[in-house]
Amino acid sequence: GVVEYMMSKVRHEKEEFEAGLQRYYAVRSVFSQMTNRLFGHIGLEALRNLTTSTRETMTNATFSRTLSDAMKHFFSVSRQNLNKSEGEIAEILAMMDAVYKKFAVEHGLKLGSPTTFSLLRQQKEINRLEQWCDAHLNTTFQMLTHDKNRVVQKFFEEVATQVRRAFERANRDAESWLKAVMAPMETQVREHQIQLKRRLESIKRIHQATETLEDRINELLHVESDLVTQVQGIAQVAYTVQRLLNQPLVERSTLAA
């Protein structure tokens, strides 16, 4: 009846949701790959490798030109990594926007639009540090009037450390953004799953209650049937007694004999 129809409908919704859940896991897998690529550019390991190679080049340099080129290379690669990261961020954002819309249409999940993110702040910081370096460190005057080791030390203490801080901030911001991008979908999927489970359990309880009610009704009908039979028997006895009482005394004596 109605309960069976409701159960069938919820089971169908559950099957559709489970199919959507598989697509969600596929999205998570692609999202994870894209995240790894992002941190391949913006990650601190890449910056650490760049810093180490730059230090070796500057320490082993015999000409001021080599020192100058090493500093320029350091900023160039740092900027390239931020630019590549921006490209990965744009791809992640485009994919998540499409996924949000798809899940909204297919499952009625209200996701809105994914939060945007940019590394513009870090890019400006890198540009500012390079300008400072070009004005106060990477100049012919500085190269001629200061010992090479002093120039190298100053570059890593006053410039490279600030670049690292900028990348550390970029990593923290990126991690927070990635969590924020996935959170609405994860929340909606989890809530939808809970709602379906509750509906199915509720309908199961109704179904069980209906079966119990039917059993109780059948039991009452059986009791009623027994009572009707008993009442009919009593009525027959009463009728017989009444007939007996209505007969003349002689006839009653004869019957009694």
Provide a role label for each language-model segment.
Residues 254-257:
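Eukaryotic, compositionally biased intrinsically disordered regions
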Residues 1-252:
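Extended helical scaffolds that flank P-loop GTPase cores
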